[in-house]
């Protein structure tokens, strides 16, 4: 039998350049019509079921080749006779999907060529191509479009590491200056160059937050906390009016930390035996209703500022700690006076970037935020609903008052601020929405918000006990009390996580206490929503010493970052401070990224069940780290004592401040 061939016919007007074909054989020919959309192949008469498709046929172009060599022709061919051999049949077989694939490629190629032709005509001012589907041959030439020069250009720097020289390549001058005084040794840079870059990237992001006036990942020791946070409001229970913090005081960590150990070598969890000297801390004694929890006008405990190269070089400054002896805290039997601050090394500080004018997009965003605030806030005059205003705090972002609610005589904390002076208004909206939507016994009670005469009033319950920070730095907590605090905190976190909210800033500063021992989460400015469509986040926010490794290394993270922070807070309750607080921030970030699970000083003083609780919550791999709900079932939490056991500790702090 003579092999069938393809005979080209008159070009089809289907716009694709595909030609219907006729397979000529001995006997009656069979015509195959290819429709315009090439999605259906319809023979003119019924054809028998084809045998199995031979996938080994050579792939070639559509036409101009024998049928046996082409895979892009029609697959169904009626031979009109049953006498043809199976080998001949296999030679005539093709795959319909190849026709569609070929057609799709032709369509994409044609569309791309038309697009390029149209854009070329547009940019050169010429008319549309007569063959283009985007124009007509009669179109008149268009006027040339003037293209402006780039605006707000940014220089992207690619930093590398040369293992032969042990030096970074392409590193900005600012980063080089910071690295010199960061405390990260040359050997550490060679071992983990990526961790060094991650720490630098976090620093740069923190600087950007500071320049924009937002709440930085490195909370700063300043009089301003532009981000409206629940802690700033409810912290009226632990605020006192003070003068503005001087700019020089912003250069040093505010949380007292012990003398750095002689060796910086890492060790496994609960393995270090370092002993540190301490001094008295009379300056940290609060008044009866005041704690040192940070606000707009009080130096934030735990919160190192975003340091410059000069201030980083002063990291050897000794930090003050309470002088009461405790088996858990790293201290010596004798106390010493703090050493004088060493003169910073002469390092040229990186010049601050020139401030840019606010873009119209930012102005539009502010308008949208203001409209949102008006829709979610009470428009009434709050001065008619609350009385007995007593100013208990002042800062650049607003004033904090204690007051009484008219009718109920309920004691509340109110923060008043001029919304037009807040640089990150969207953070305020975020926090208000979280607080209004989530009510739980372990979350600070949100009462109301007022937007009246361009001023925002946030009303929260009055937490007179202050923050957990004062308790852990001035008292020795038993394992039962630590278990109680962890249990209450985890219950609040579980509620947030079940509702798709990750807190991202769990630490003792953001755990508030009442005089009855109630334990509640606060400060929801860093909260983020995670739903089924977005199960992970990558933004580097939070406070570095409590930050999970996956955040520091800029990986995707989820709810379990809060579990890690809880584990760090548990160490804080044991030792009075989080790990690496005595290190400067850049080195602390490096250690978190490279060491992972931190160590504590006296592991032999902890029970095995507490040790296991710390190990579980501080598991480096987030996939193996338990969730908040799973950690709530840990045996350690069964040792929890009633929260009322914290009342004497809270009251002792207040009475000592009298």
Swiss-Prot record:
Biased composition range(s): Low complexity: 129-140, 226-254, 262-272
Top-level taxon of the source organism: Eukaryota
PTM field: Autophosphorylated on serine residues.
Chief location bin: cytoplasm
Residues engaged in binding ATP: 392-400, 415
Cellular compartments annotated: Cytoplasm; Cytoplasm, Cytoskeleton, Spindle
A GO molecular-function descriptor: protein serine kinase activity
InterPro entries: CRIB_dom, CRIB_dom_sf, Kinase-like_dom_sf, PAK3-like, PAK_BD, Prot_kinase_dom, Protein_kinase_ATP_BS, Ser/Thr_kinase_AS
Keyword Disulfide bond tagged: no
E.C. no: 2.7.11.1
PTM-bearing positions, type Phosphoserine: 301, 303
Substrates-to-products reaction catalysed: L-seryl-[protein] + ATP = O-phospho-L-seryl-[protein] + ADP + H(+); L-threonyl-[protein] + ATP = O-phospho-L-threonyl-[protein] + ADP + H(+)
Keywords: ATP-binding, Cytoplasm, Cytoskeleton, Kinase, Nucleotide-binding, Phosphoprotein, Serine/threonine-protein kinase, Transferase
Assigned GO CC terms: Cdc42 GTPase complex; cell cortex of cell tip; cell division site; cell tip; cytoplasm; cytosol; mitotic actomyosin contractile ring; mitotic actomyosin contractile ring, intermediate layer
Self-association state and partner proteins as the record states: Forms an activated complex with GTP-bound ras-like cdc42. Interacts with skb1 and the SH3 domain of skb5 via its amino-terminal regulatory domain. Skb1, cdc42 and shk1 are able to form a ternary complex in vivo. Interacts with rga8 and may interact with byr2.
Family: Belongs to the protein kinase superfamily. STE Ser/Thr protein kinase family. STE20 subfamily.
Function: MAP4K component of the MAPK pathway required for the mating pheromone response. Phosphorylates histone H2B to form H2BS10ph. Phosphorylates tea1. Required for skb1-dependent mitotic inhibitory function. Regulates microtubule dynamics and cell polarity.
Listed name of the protein: Serine/threonine-protein kinase shk1/pak1
Species classification: Eukaryota, Fungi, Dikarya, Ascomycota, Taphrinomycotina
């Amino acid at each position: 039998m003579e092999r069938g061939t393809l005979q080209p016919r008159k070009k089809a007007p289907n716009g694709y350049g595909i030609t219907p074909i006729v397979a000529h054989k001995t006997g009656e020919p069979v015509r195959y019509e290819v429709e315009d959309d090439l999605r259906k192949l319809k023979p003119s008469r019924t054809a028998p079921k084809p045998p199995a498709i031979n996938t080994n046929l050579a792939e070639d172009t559509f036409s101009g080749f024998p049928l046996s060599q082409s895979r892009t022709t029609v697959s169904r061919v009626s031979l009109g006779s049953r006498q043809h051999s199976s080998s001949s049949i296999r030679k005539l077989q093709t795959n319909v999907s190849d026709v569609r694939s070929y057609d799709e490629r032709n369509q994409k190629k044609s569309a791309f060529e038309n697009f390029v032709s149209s854009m070329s005509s547009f940019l050169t001012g010429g008319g549309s191509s007569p063959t283009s589907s985007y124009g007509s041959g009669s179109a008149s030439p268009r006027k040339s479009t003037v293209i402006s020069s780039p605006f707000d250009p940014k220089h992207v720097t690619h930093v590398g590491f040369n293992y032969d020289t042990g030096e970074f390549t392409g590193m900005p001058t600012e980063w080089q200056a910071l690295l010199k005084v960061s405390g990260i040794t040359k050997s550490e840079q060679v071992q983990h160059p990526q961790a060094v870059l991650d720490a630098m990237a976090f620093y740069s992001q923190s600087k950007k937050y500071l320049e924009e006036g937002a709440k930085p990942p490195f909370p700063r020791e300043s009089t301003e906390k532009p981000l409206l946070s629940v802690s700033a409001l409810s912290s009226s229970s632990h605020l006192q009016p003070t003068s503005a913090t001087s700019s020089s005081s912003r250069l040093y960590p505010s949380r007292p930390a012990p003398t750095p150990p002689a060796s910086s070598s890492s060790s496994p969890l609960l393995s270090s035996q370092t002993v540190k000297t301490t001094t008295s801390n009379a300056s940290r004694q609060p008044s009866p209703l005041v704690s040192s929890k940070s606000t707009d006008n009080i130096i934030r405990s735990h919160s190192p500022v975003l340091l410059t190269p000069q201030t980083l070089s002063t990291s050897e400054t000794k930090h003050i700690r309470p002088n009461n002896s405790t088996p858990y805290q790293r201290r010596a039997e004798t106390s010493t006076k703090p050493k004088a601050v060493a003169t910073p090394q002469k390092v040229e500080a990186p010049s601050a970037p020139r401030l840019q004018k606010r873009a119209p997009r930012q102005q539009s965003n502010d308008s949208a935020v203001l409209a949102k605030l008006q829709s979610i806030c009470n428009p009434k005059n709050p001065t008619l609903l609350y009385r007995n205003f007593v100013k208990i705090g002042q800062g650049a972002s607003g004033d904090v008052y204690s007051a009484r609610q008219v009718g109920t005589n309920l004691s509340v904390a109110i923060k008043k601020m001029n919304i037009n002076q807040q640089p990150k208004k969207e953070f305020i909206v975020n926090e208000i929405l979280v607080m209004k939507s989530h009510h739980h016994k372990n979350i600070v009670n949100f009462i109301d918000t007022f937007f009246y005469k361009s001023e925002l009033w946030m009303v929260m319950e009055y937490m007179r006990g202050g923050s957990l920070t004062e308790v852990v730095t001035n008292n020795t907590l038993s394992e039962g009390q630590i278990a109680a605090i962890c249990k209450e905190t985890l219950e609040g976190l579980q509620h947030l996580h079940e509702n798709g909210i990750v807190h991202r800033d769990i630490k003792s500063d953001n755990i508030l206490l009442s005089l009855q021992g109630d334990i509640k989460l606060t400060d929801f400015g860093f909260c983020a929503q995670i739903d089924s469509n977005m199960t992970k986040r990558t933004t580097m926010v939070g406070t570095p010493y409590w930050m999970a490794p996956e955040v520091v290394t800029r990986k995707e993270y989820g709810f379990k970052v809060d579990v890690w922070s809880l584990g760090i807070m548990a160490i804080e309750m044991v030792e009075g401070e989080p790990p690496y607080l005595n290190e400067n921030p850049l080195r602390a970030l490096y250690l978190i990224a490279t060491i992972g699970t931190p160590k504590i000083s006296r592991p032999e003083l902890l029970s095995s069940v507490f040790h296991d609780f710390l190990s579980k919550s501080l598991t480096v791999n987030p996939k193996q780290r338990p969730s908040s709900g799973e950690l709530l079932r840990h045996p350690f939490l069964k040792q929890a004592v009633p929260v009322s056991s914290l009342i004497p500790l809270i009251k002792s702090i207040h009475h000592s401040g009298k």
